[in-house]
């Protein structure tokens, strides 16, 4: 994610309960950090694709209507844990001169507690991974410690990741504390499985659903990072990475990191396709054209040619299905063809197919491809099944 934060791995301070109670920062000579960590947001302004959530939180802070607990849900890599740390930073933001008297979302500079909070080593911001600390004893420790005032910050903030992994007994032990916590305590929960969280817990929290980030937003974000890193990258390559990430910022940064290493600093679309095991987009469209014209011999020949150079039959069919979906969207929403996340060839030819193919044909192709993908995935000879 694009941001001013520059966190490092805490080298000390994790006690046996799973909480990080503070530790020493790393030495000045730091090893290489992956892009997902290097460009992790440190303020609400740095978050991308979550405007609705940021607006609600901003208004809550401005009006003083700050709840005792938040629960953040969404797919992997959209910023749940990062948002939790930013909330903790905003709650405890203080300047050395004492000019900030209460919680604020306006954090232009690093405050007294900011660095330690974003590095997950502040003694008043306690993080617990519920995936490895699922029992009632872990929650009892929170219940016992929450009564004590924070040591140095304004609030004691408990961040519990993957909260849906807590046991039923642990959730039940939490209810009273969660409903009536001390004024100095705040809770932030993060989960990818909101349906597994008991309604009794949800009713005590303010819920935010973090959305998948649109491909064009991811492309712009990756382009900004490429500029900062001094990396040359083709726009089409950014589009491929953005679509492959499926709305996950962390996934897009991980793939971009891998692409930079794969291409030795100059990221091209063909190199990214090779890295991801994708078929050449032009050849996928040629295969689609043969199928649309009913030229089965040409379609078989094109598929065999792609298979012979290493294309996975499942990937070829999935790419075909994705292109059918794109053409269908262009047919009903012509502006879809202006999305820069798709290559120029894909957009131009997509418009042409949308104009000449009927909805009935596109729908039939979509249904057949979905069935074909399912069959090929379980076939002993995928190429023959395709």
Predicted regions and their residues:
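Extended, largely alpha-helical regulatory/partner-binding modules appended to the mid-to-C-terminal parts
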Residues: 21-23, 97, 106, 113, ...
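P-loop/Walker A NTP-binding region and its immediately flanking N-terminal helices
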Residues: 1-207
């Amino acid at each position: 994610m694009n941001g001013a934060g520059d966190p490092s791995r805490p080298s000390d301070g994790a006690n046996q309960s799973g909480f990080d109670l503070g530790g020493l920062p790393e030495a000045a000579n730091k090893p290489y950090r992956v892009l997902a960590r290097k460009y992790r947001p440190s303020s609400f302004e740095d978050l991308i694709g979550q405007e609705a959530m940021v607006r609600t939180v901003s208004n809550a802070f401005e009006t003083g209507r700050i709840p005792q607990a938040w629960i953040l849900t969404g797919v992997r890599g959209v910023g749940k844990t990062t948002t939790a740390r930013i909330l903790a930073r905003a709650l405890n933001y203080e300047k050395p001169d004492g000019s900030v008297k209460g919680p604020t979302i306006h954090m232009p500079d690093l405050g007294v507690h900011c660095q330690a909070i974003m590095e997950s080593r502040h003694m008043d911001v306690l993080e617990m991974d519920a995936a490895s600390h699922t029992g009632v004893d872990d929650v009892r420790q929170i219940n016992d410690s929450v009564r004590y005032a924070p040591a140095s910050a304004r609030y004691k903030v408990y961040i519990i990741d993957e909260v849906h992994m807590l046991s039923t007994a642990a959730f039940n032990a939490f209810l009273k504390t969660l409903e009536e916590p001390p004024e100095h305590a705040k809770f932030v929960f993060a989960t990818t499985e909101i349906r597994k969280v008991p309604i009794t817990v949800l009713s005590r929290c303010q819920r935010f659903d973090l959305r998948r980030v649109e491909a064009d937003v991811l492309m712009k974000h990756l382009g900004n990072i490429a500029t900062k890193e001094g990396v040359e990258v083709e726009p089409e390559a950014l589009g491929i990475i953005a679509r492959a990430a499926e709305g996950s910022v962390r996934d897009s940064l991980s793939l971009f990191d891998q692409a930079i290493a794969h291409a030795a600093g100059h990221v091209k679309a063909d190199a990214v396709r090779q890295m991801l095991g994708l078929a050449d987009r032009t050849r996928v469209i040629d295969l689609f054209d043969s199928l649309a014209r009913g030229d089965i011999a040409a379609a078989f020949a094109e598929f065999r040619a792609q298979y012979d150079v290493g294309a996975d039959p499942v990937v070829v069919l999935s790419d075909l299905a994705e292109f059918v979906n794109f053409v269908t969207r262009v047919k009903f929403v012509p502006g879809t063809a202006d999305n820069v996340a798709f290559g120029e060839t894909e957009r131009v030819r997509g418009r042409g197919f949308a104009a000449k193919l009927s909805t009935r044909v596109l729908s039939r192709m979509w249904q057949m491809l979905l069935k074909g993908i399912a069959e090929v995935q379980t076939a002993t000879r995928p190429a023959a099944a395709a």
